[in-house]
Amino acid sequence: CNPTTVLDYRKLLLEVDGVRNAWLEPVGTNGPPHLYLPPESTGPELQCWPEDGSVSRPNPVVLNGLYSVLIQKETGEDDKKVFMSVRERLAAHRNLCEDFKAITILCPLEIGVCADVEIDVGADAAAVYEAIIRALRSYIAPELKYYTLKELLDKGRAIEDVFAGRPFLRSRSVGFVDTKELEALHLRDELFGSDLYSAVLGVGGVVAIRSICFQTSVSPGGDTIQRVRVLPGFVAEFSLDRTCVQLQTTRGVLSLDKERIHRRLQEGTKPKRGLEHLDLPVPTGRYLP
């Protein structure tokens, strides 16, 4: 079956190799209309909205069912390959009176965090450091979790909600996503330093934060950044290379094997599960002689 809602389309696109996340935006609802009917036109000829202001009295037109598609790709994936795969998948499942104005592969904005954190004297420094990095990554670039059918049912999700809007695939799949978790993953345009404080202070063993700020690929050297704006066409991605978290106690600065911890924190690829993990078993029945 074809998608019927924006969330359904997002679930469909998550099955495409190389796609980490996807968003659909109705054209014309957020900002000025992109189509207009020329004043001199005598027929139903729509044109794109001119950016140079050459049209003085355009007649704006908003079409239902016209979307812009925004794609966050997996690290290292080829833009053109992902674009072609997304376009092919959308074309195969497009409904009548629906179309896609543009498919945009978002550029990654690498964001790290520099912090000086005090922890308890008796705390496991390596475990606290790993938990801090995970908390920072979860705030800057939260990841979707994929489930088997059993895992979602164990979370208390009703089976009709689990399968609602999920694409029917005949082979392997990445699994299920929790609809509530998917809805919560918005394409954000701002990140705030105050949220970094909340994320780190929520880690067990942390006593205080002496300093914390963002470090981005576009930030001037030496600046203390407490707010990051993510421009249109970009998506925030957490960068370990731009992150420097120093731990200390009342006894002094702690030394850690950070490279070893970083290897454990490397992002994995999306899972590929067989259909036996994505459906209920068929009852075997009883043999009656």
Language-model features: locations:
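C-terminal structured "cap/appendage" subdomains that terminate the fold
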Residues: 148-152, 166-228
